Design a protein with these regions (language model features):
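Acidic, Ala/Val/Gly-enriched low-complexity intrinsically disordered segments
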Residues: 2, 14, 29-31, 40
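Ser/Thr/Pro/Gly-rich low-complexity, intrinsically disordered segments
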Residues: 5, 18-20, 35
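Non-catalytic C-terminal accessory region of glycerolipid acyltransferases
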Residues: 15, 49-58, 151-304
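Membrane-anchoring hydrophobic helices of lipid-metabolizing enzymes
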Residues: 16-19, 24-26, 39-94, 104-106, ...
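Catalytic core of membrane glycerolipid acyltransferases/transacylases, capturing the structured
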Residues: 59-60, 87-147, 155
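A generic structural signal for well-ordered alpha-helical segments
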Residues: 71, 112, 134-135, 160, ...
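A conditional alpha-helix N-cap/helix-loop micro-motif detector
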Residues: 76, 146-150, 177
Length: 304
């Protein structure tokens, strides 16, 4: 019977997850298990060899909550519509939207909680050590826009099939395009999942966000493409038309709710302390993430 080290603890803070733990407590805790092929080392990381996942679920939940606290503190005027149309937590799907701001993915992820997602990101975003580590930990994978590889399609398909995470995609590919590209159609068809459209209507600039302009997230009808037998040019065009049509319908529907009415300014008495707290937590998170980025590589523990 082989005894393997499964946990090391030191310090004061915990991140719990199925295969990845930071333990910062006041004393060292040693645990041995004859059943699990696990190990730990002085770097304070626990890694379960038996299971590969697409990011750290606990860190994802933590970071999503922290970013939403910051957005709530500086804006606090977000509204979510037709959330009853979102598929159940047991179903994987592709959440698609026209990419309009830097923060619309956060609102998308928050509105669909507790569901977690993986998402594509241009490779340049991974060059920053801390931000790149954050998005990798949350399940992001890099895409080379100039020379896209087969993994850009293969990886999200495997995630949708083998895990309980869904996929966020912006079919236009960037914030400067409205054309729906074919990647989402191929992934949805091969993974046999539905496409869930959502639109963001709200401030396009940081100034507008801080001035508390209204944010509306409107969810559409899930799009089933199982009736399209072949994903040739014609099939991809049919999917693109369905997605674009739903985007246009959602934008038109949102007009009835969207206005420039701002919340009571007295709310700032609550939001300012919340923002200060969020910033302090963010600073601690940045410091800890910088240290952790030298220790833990999320790429070694993802679905292939």
């Amino acid at each position: 019977m082989e005894l393997t080290l499964t946990r090391i603890s030191t310090g004061f803070y915990d991140f719990y997850q199925t295969n990845f733990h930071f333990y910062w407590r006041w004393k060292l805790v040693w645990e041995f298990s004859p059943k699990q092929k696990t190990f730990a080392c002085p770097s304070m990381i626990r890694y379960n060899k038996r299971k590969k996942i697409e990011g750290d679920t606990m860190f994802y939940t933590y970071l999503r909550g922290l970013v939403m606290l910051i957005l709530w503190s500086i804006n606090g005027n977000a509204h979510y519509h037709n959330t009853d149309k979102i598929p159940s937590q047991d179903e994987n799907y592709i959440l698609v939207a026209p990419h309009r701001t830097w923060w619309d993915p956060v609102y998308m992820a928050f509105a669909t909680k507790p569901k977690q997602f993986v998402f594509m990101a241009k490779k340049e975003l991974f060059s920053n050590r801390i931000f790149g580590w954050w998005i990798r930990m949350c399940g992001a994978f890099p895409i080379d826009r100039e020379n896209p590889s087969a993994s850009a399609i293969k990886y999200p398909i495997n995630v949708l099939k083998k895990s309980d995470r869904s996929l966020i995609m912006f079919p236009s590919g960037s914030r400067h395009s409205n054309d729906v590209k074919g990647g989402v159609a191929l992934i949805a068809k091969m993974a046999k999942v539905r496409i869930m459209p959502v639109t963001y209507t709200g401030p396009m600039t940081l100034k507008g966000l801080i001035s508390r302009e209204r944010v509306d997230m409107n969810f559409g009808n899930p799009i089933d493409i199982s009736d399209i037998k072949k994903m040739n040019d014609e099939g991809i065009e049919m999917v693109a038309e369905r997605i674009q049509s739903e985007f246009q319908r959602l934008d038109e529907e949102t007009k009835q709710w969207h206005n420039n009415k701002k919340p009571n300014p007295l709310w700032w008495f609550i939001r300012i302390p919340a923002l200060i707290l969020a910033v302090l937590v963010a600073i601690i998170t940045i410091i800890c993430s910088f240290i952790a980025s030298f220790i833990w590589n999320p790429e070694k523990n993802k679905i292939n």
